């Protein structure tokens, strides 16, 4: 692969020279070449080098290596993270203080950058782990290997887990059968029809008797009230008419005994 140089200018020209930085990234297909920062100024004055290379065995593995060279050290210290083919790792670089402010693109004095590495992205035994850039602080490290677990950063989960797939709800595979038994439906319909026919005949008989009563009772023919020829009105007048007939029969019996000269008992 060709070597590409990318220079990031982090501020206007009137800012202090300490805030300026240059990052040189080399992509190599074979070998283990380490490229240093040519500027030697700004936050990268501590000789922190970054190298991105693909594996030479043809398996299309991508290895991210961070090499830090001290002032009095001859052997650089490297932290390597290898991602196998078909595996997508999530890496977030946080720049800015943890006081509620949003991350900024400019390096500030006294701030430290942190990188988030999931535990599943690291292969045991290859020395994989999180790396911290900018101003190196002791104690902000993670043990290499599978026992190290995950390195969590202080930020919202939406920013850290950008590549996480959303949970999908499985579609319904079984359709509920709401069909009712045909034989039961036919039987219920027959029973309902029979019951309705019996009720209709009973109502017809009652209505016929009420019509006959309305013809016998004389007051029903001249009733012009709100009830009209209602069933309740006809039955009420029928009861009154029966009571009047009883009283008339009693009076007539008394008058007949008086006329015959027999005392009433």
From Swiss-Prot:
Segments carrying the region annotation (Disordered) are: 1-21, 119-149
UniProt-listed Pfam families: HLH (PF00010)
Record bears the keyword Amino-acid biosynthesis: no
* Bias (Polar residues) ranges: 134-144
Q: Write down the InterPro entries for this protein, in alphabetical order.
A: bHLH_dom (IPR011598), HLH_DNA-bd_sf (IPR036638), USF (IPR051732)
Its recorded name reads Upstream stimulatory factor
The protein's UniProt keywords, in alphabetical order, are: DNA-binding, Nucleus, Transcription, Transcription regulation
What's the domain of life for this entry?
Eukaryota
The answer to whether keyword rRNA-binding applies is no
User: Residue ranges of the bHLH domain?
Assistant: 190-245
Report the source organism.
Strongylocentrotus purpuratus (Purple sea urchin)
